[in-house]
Design a protein with these regions (language model features):
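A non-transmembrane, solvent-exposed segment enriched in polar/low-complexity residues
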Residues: 20-176, 186-187, 191-216
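Non-catalytic, surface beta->alpha helical segment in thiol-disulfide oxidoreductase systems
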Residues: 74-77, 462, 467-503
Length: 503
């Protein structure tokens, strides 16, 4: 939880779309090489263009608009999309005059002609940059060959962090109630100063963590849209969910609800936060975190609490539809039953007419003509007797499958050698029986080799098989334990599940 502040926190050198805003920002930039310049602002993890000056004469850059600029950290950006410097905008800086020079001294020469607080902010940025250079210089002169060198560098880092912390505390105290003080406050992490001792005599890390988490969002105004228009808020938000919140989908959902409750529905910060959480957990690569996405859909999108988040109402419908598809497939959910046909029964199914049916109506007629026989041929997923069932959907012609299936064969054989009660319910996603049977024979697939011979299951929709292969692990009760994993993870995960079951 110790923070490392040795980064250039406001840019004197990066960059993007929106427009609108009585404001007048006049910047005199000596030796300016540009013919146009941009006024940009930060918003969560992105940067947007607010205005463009298309005529620069004698270094004079002017941005004007009929509406007020929203509170935030703004940047002067060159025509080559490089940031010259950052400055803040609040209610008192809608008419702002700045001057500097386009050189290595741009930060030192930067002055606000009509805003003392802006100058205090510029001094703060210069202080941070000076401290950063001091540390880098010390690091370059320290060879770091011995433990003594490392200790010296660590001591220097602690000293600089302390200096920055003291400067920031003083700045926040002296300018309390201002927008820029609130922005700098976002960098702060509230640590328990007098940590009590645990029973072992050491500092109680649990109490320290609980205090840190409880006070993490102190003095952060979730009703102020300007809270998200700076370079710090997104990092603070990301750090909270990656390093502070217990890494579990349920805990994450609870914390999202707490944060959303702090923001007022309909405000920009509310919309941005909800859109951010929705995208983050819809696209999460961490197994099980699609549960958070489903929670967001159920709690916000289905209840009208996401109204206005997206301009296109179809996006809301798509989000709900996607979440509803994932809901029965969440880790911990009972697996949807499947009724597949053995690969060796392909010719029998073909003789009944299943492969010749041209549409769903013909397929239905064929099924009902042969109901009794087909029902006897079905291999139900729910009937598989095993401590663990590996459910895999794949295709003979799929390049990735050709790499993954041999790995799965090895994993399965190794599990059998260890006397594990495991079976593989292998579903071929096409209907080219000869090709399937040939692959099975040539590669000696030791699985339950199946396919949807009666066109009965619609596994693509039921199991979200938008690409192949897709691998699930089910327990003896056919509850989903793992999903969308690589073949080389199968044995490791089953070993983990077995170890957990023995505890």
């Amino acid at each position: 939880m110790k923070k490392f502040l040795l980064t250039v926190v406001f840019s004197f050198s990066c960059f993007l779309t929106s427009a609108q805003s009585g404001y007048e920002i006049t910047i005199t930039l000596k030796n300016c090489p540009d013919s146009l310049a941009y006024l940009t602002y930060y918003q969560l993890d992105k940067t947007f263009i607010k205005d463009t000056c298309t005529s620069i004469k004698n270094g004079k850059i002017v941005f004007t608009g009929k509406s007020k600029l929203e509170k935030g950290i703004y940047s002067l950006v060159s025509q080559k999309k490089a940031i010259y410097f950052d400055f803040f905008i609040d209610d008192n800086t809608q008419k702002l005059e700045l001057k500097s020079e386009a050189s290595a001294n741009i930060g030192k020469e930067l002055t606000a002609l009509n805003s003392p607080l802006q100058n205090e902010f510029f001094k703060y940025v210069q202080f941070i940059n000076t401290q950063n250079k001091d540390f880098q210089s010390f690091r370059e002169t320290t060879k770091l060959l011995t433990k003594k060198d490392s200790l010296a560098l660590s001591k220097k880092q602690t000293e600089i962090e302390g200096s920055i912390k003291n400067y920031e505390e003083k700045f926040i105290t002296e300018h309390k109630g201002t927008y820029i003080a609130d922005v700098i406050n976002l960098k702060f992490e509230k640590l328990l100063k007098d940590v009590p001792k645990a029973s072992n005599g050491r500092p109680d890390s649990i109490q320290a963590y609980q205090y840190y988490k409880k006070h993490y969002w102190d003095n952060v105004d979730f009703k102020e849209d300007g809270t998200v228009r700076n370079p710090f808020f997104n990092g603070k938000l990301k750090r909270y969910f990656e390093s502070v919140v217990y890494r579990h989908p349920d805990s994450t959902s609870v914390e999202i609800d707490k944060i959303m409750a702090k923001a007022q529905q309909g405000t920009l910060i509310y919309k941005l936060l909800l859109a951010h959480f929705t995208y983050t957990y819809e696209t999460s690569k961490i197994m099980g975190y699609d549960k958070v996405f489903v929670h967001i859909s159920d709690r916000y999108f289905k209840t009208g609490k996401a109204d206005g988040i997206y301009d296109d109402s179809e996006i809301v419908k798509k989000i709900i539809k996607r979440a509803d598809k994932l809901k029965p497939l969440l880790v911990g959910s009972p697996a949807i039953d499947l009724f597949m046909i053995k690969a060796e029964d392909f010719d029998k199914m073909k003789a009944m007419g299943f492969e010749d049916a041209k549409n769903s109506e013909e397929m239905t007629n064929v099924f009902y003509k042969n109901t009794d026989q087909v029902n006897k041929m079905f291999v139900k997923l729910s009937d598989v007797k095993a401590d663990y069932t590996i459910l895999v959907f794949w295709d003979v012609d799929c390049g990735h499958c050709q790499k993954e299936i041999p790995v799965l064969v090895d994993a399965y054989n190794n599990l059998l050698k260890e006397k594990k009660n495991v079976k593989v319910y292998s579903v071929y996603m096409q209907h080219e029986g000869d090709k399937y049977l040939k692959y099975i024979a040539e590669n000696k697939l030791p699985f339950m080799n199946l396919y949807d011979g009666a066109h009965y299951n619609n596994a693509i929709e039921k199991y979200d098989v938008y690409s192949t292969p897709v691998i699930y692990i089910l327990d003896k009760n056919k509850v989903i334990k793992a999903k969308r994993i690589d073949a080389n993870q199968v044995k490791t995960l089953i070993d983990v599940f077995e170890a957990e079951a023995k505890k």
